[in-house]
Each structure stands twice: as C-alpha cells, then as structure tokens.
Amino acid sequence: MNPNQKLFASSGIAIALGIINLLIGISNMSLNISLYSKGENHKSDNLTCTNINQNNTTMVNTYINNTTIIDKNTKMENPGYLLLNKSLCNVEGWVVIAKDNAIRFGESEQIIVTREPYVSCDPLSCKMYALHQGTTIRNKHSNGTTHDRTAFRGLISTPLGNPPTVSNSEFICVGWSSTSCHDGVSRMTICVQGNNENATATVYYNKRLTTTIKTWAKNILRTQESECVCHNSTCVVVMTDGPANNQAFTKVIYFHKGTIIKEEPLKGSAKHIEECSCYGHNQRVTCVCRDNWQGANRPVIEIDMNNLEHTSRYICTGVLTDTSRPKDKAIGECFNPITGSPGAPGIKGFGFLNENNTWLGRTISPKLRSGFEMLKIPNAGTDPDSKIKERQEIVGNDNWSGYSGSFIDYWNDNSECYNPCFYVELIRGRPEEAKYVEWTSNSLIALCGSPIPVGSGSFPDGAQIKYFS
C-alpha cells in the first residue's frame, strides 16, 4: 500500500470512529432526557446497584440523573443461631419490668379478651403472646369466654406492657394451646386447633406453615402455654396428649426450622406432664412443669441440647409449689409425686433451678389462684431437706393471680449470664367473679431478676369488676 492509500484508509477509520462517538453521544443525551423526565414524575425511581464483597463491605452505587453516588457501609452480619453458652445470673430479688393493666383499661377501651399469656423475646425485643377469644371485653360475644377450647381462639402478640387491642395486636395462628420461641434467625410457633378428640398442631417457622402434628392419643393434644427454647438451630417443645387426671402420653419434640428432626416419649420418673415452663442455660434446657394427676410437687424435664436427649424427675424440696396443694413437707421427694388433700388438679408454674440461687414461684393461697410469691430455696432441685431462705411477695393474697411461667432475653449483651425473668397472669371475671360479669380475661405483669436486694411491693390487677356490671 502506497502512502496515499494509507492516508485515505486512516482518514476513513477516523471518520467511522467519529460517527460512532456521535451516535453514542446522541444515545446518552436521549437516555438522560428520558431519565430526567421519568425522575420528574417518579423522583424515587433511581437506579441502584449493590455489591457485597467477601469482607461484608457493601458498595451502593446509586445513579441519579446520570450521576453516580457511591456509599460505602459496613454490612451488619446476621445475628446467627442462638447458642445457650451462659449460665443463669444470681438473683437477689425481683423487679417489675412491665404491667399492662388490661382489665382496668378494658372498662372503657376495646381490650381483647385473652388468657394463657406469656412473654418471649427475639434479638430485637420482648413481646407478650396470648390466646385471644375472638372478642373484646365490652363485646357481647365475651359472655361465656371461660371456656378454654373454642373455634374462635388464636395466638396474638403485642408489645410488652401494652394492653392487647385490635390495632396493636399481631395475629400469629389459630388455636387454643400454643408455644413460641426464636432461634436467633427466625421464630417458630406452634398452635393446637380442632376438636378435643381429634386435634391438630400447626407449626410455623418465619410465619410460614412448615409442619402439622395430629393427635396421638385423641384426648386434647396440648403444649406449653409459654415459650419454648432453641440452641444452635434446634428448638425443643414438650407436648402432651391424653387424660388430665390419669396416665397421659408426653413427647419431647426437637425441631429445625419448623420441621421435626427427633421425637422422644417421656423418660424418667415424672408421672404426668403438662404446661411446661422452660429456660435455657449451659447448652441445656430445663422445664418445670405441672403434674395435673397426682403431684403437688412440680416435675422437671432436663434436656441435653447437644445429644438431644432428656430425663425427668421432680423438684426435690418439700416446699410445694402447685395449686391446689397440701401443707409443705419437712422432707421432699425427688422421684415421686407428693400427694395429699387438697391436691390435684394444678396450675401452670415455673422455677429457676440454679443450685444455691434457686427460686420457685407459687400462689400464696394453697387452694385458690390468689396471691403470688417468689421463694428462694437453695438447692431445691436436688436436696429433699432444702428450706425457704427468702420470700418476696409479688401479688397480695387478697387479689387474683393465675398461670405463671419463665422467659429469658437471651440476646441481652450487657450481661455475661442469662438473667431469669417470669410473668404472672392476673385472671379476672368468671368463675370467681361470676356475680358481676360473664367473661373471663386477664392482665399481665412481668418481672426480671436483680443482682442486688430490692424493696417490697404488691402488683395486683387492680380493676374494679363492679364497674363492668
């Protein structure tokens, strides 16, 4: 190729490149006009590209009117599965952290009728869970809500300390018996629904149905009525089916993301198990339960969350904590129920079995669901000779109480141990106050342990039921 041909060829290439650049420029101008016009009508419609590198650094590239804004943020890692690696904190007394006064508010506000409330926490907060009756206190449908199992019941949650209303309550699942717990990543919930002789448990994980469990004894399949506990992605639940006043059939069931990975029939010396109050510690779960058949002493289930195995026995102390119950005994029983008049049927309760710092809760009345007290009984879980060392009144005996159970905020990073907490249900209405109202509902108080001694006080429901007449 001679010099003139080379010159013409180079000129042609330059002209072609110039035309291409001109076309690209026109395209960019058209795109900018289009984006600007679209942004005027939809100012939030910006283009965003997010890239996450291996160091968990997030690069956010936001294109606004052809301008790139780069934000560099450190991504918060997922909290991960809960590991029960701490022991219980020592407690010298109990302080109230929440009291919802639901019945007092219910005299003039639209408060939902509930029973069987409990408290359960997640990495962000603690909430109250309760089984509603499909009505509010002032609604005529509240008549007859003393019945435990109806088609209108379901589990709701509300911010702890707030009385449950239609506007602040979140529906969880349909049923008349429940338990719920968070594994650090998401929440698992179980509700039992249906007929007494043919009930079904529905299991939800991350608010999605994952498993169903059909009755195995055709006699009121039921579960804890307080929170379950998880360790390293496995959540354990105690469920019972069978007679309330005779030999029943209890299972300890292990779940992963809402699906069953193992079942165990009840082992050990406990004769009857219902409504367990469970808490986690040292890679174990301890459940303090209700013997509705024979024992005024409470049965205990100890669960190894590494081996997924359990055993059962009774709290050893002769200080009895069920209701109704006979007089306290000088010597307790570790492996057999303590009977006597008045004895059965019983009430849901709890305890924290922490060797020398063991605390047990019970109604003050041995016969009625009234009053509530916490008793410090060193080594009550293992020593039949153990005696009451300290007593703290929570609700005076001239006021109604009800179910009680344990809970723990496992995500409280301010402590090197798990601070024990509990709640007390304050039942109002029928059957004790049938003279004034036709409904049964409750308010709730929640308390947590203090590392130093505390003062005194009584925290009753406080509503004047005659105002509802």
Curated annotation (Swiss-Prot):
GO biological process: carbohydrate metabolic process; viral budding from plasma membrane
TM regions (residue ranges): 7-27
Region annotated Hypervariable stalk region, chain positions: 36-85
Keyword Membrane: yes
Needed cofactors: Ca(2+)
Binding site for substrate: 115, 149, 274-275, 290, 369
Localization in the cell: Virion membrane; Host apical cell membrane
Membrane topology: Single-pass type II membrane protein
SUPFAM superfamilies, A to Z: Sialidases
GO cellular component, as recorded: host cell plasma membrane; membrane; virion membrane
Positions of region (Head of neuraminidase): 88-469
Modifications after synthesis and translation: N-glycosylated.
UniProt free text on domains: Intact N-terminus is essential for virion morphogenesis. Possesses two apical sorting signals, one in the ectodomain, which is likely to be a glycan, and the other in the transmembrane domain. The transmembrane domain also plays a role in lipid raft association.
Sequence similarity: Belongs to the glycosyl hydrolase 34 family.
Quaternary data: Homotetramer.
Miscellaneous remark of the record: The influenza A genome consist of 8 RNA segments. Genetic variation of hemagglutinin and/or neuraminidase genes results in the emergence of new influenza strains. The mechanism of variation can be the result of point mutations or the result of genetic reassortment between segments of two different strains.
UniProt name for this protein: Neuraminidase
